[in-house]
């Protein structure tokens, strides 16, 4: 099985499955070998990606410019890198 979340130096890399247009922003848990995250933004004109980077920045206590979508810009399956996070959410720590 592939890794869901791992450390790469001082960065955290996450494999995500995104559920857009949800009623609230939340980490839902594991979805196969990915971490499922519900976001309120619709998957239109990059709004979901923008919302995701802002949300991950908030959860990891970094600027949104330090959150990079490495793979999956146009799909629900994404690989995201958070550069030098100041905090790691408990849901992520549990599977790290």
From Swiss-Prot:
It holds the Pfam family DUF167. Gene3D superfamilies: YggU-like (3.30.1200.10). It comes from the Bacteria. GO terms for cellular component: cytoplasm. Transmembrane segments: none annotated. HAMAP family: UPF0235 (MF_00634). Belongs to the UPF0235 family. This is UPF0235 protein VV1_1522. It comes from Vibrio vulnificus (strain CMCP6).
């Amino acid at each position: 099985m592939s890794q869901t979340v791992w450390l790469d130096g001082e960065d955290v890399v996450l494999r995500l499955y995104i559920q857009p247009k949800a009623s609230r922003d939340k980490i839902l848990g594991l979805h196969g070998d990915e971490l499922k995250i519900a976001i309120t933004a619709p998957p239109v004109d990059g709004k979901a990606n923008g919302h995701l980077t802002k949300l991950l920045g908030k959860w990891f206590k970094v600027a949104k410019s330090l959150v990079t979508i490495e793979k999956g810009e146009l799909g629900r399956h994404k690989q995201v890198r958070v550069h030098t996070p100041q905090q790691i959410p408990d849901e992520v720590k549990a599977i790290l």
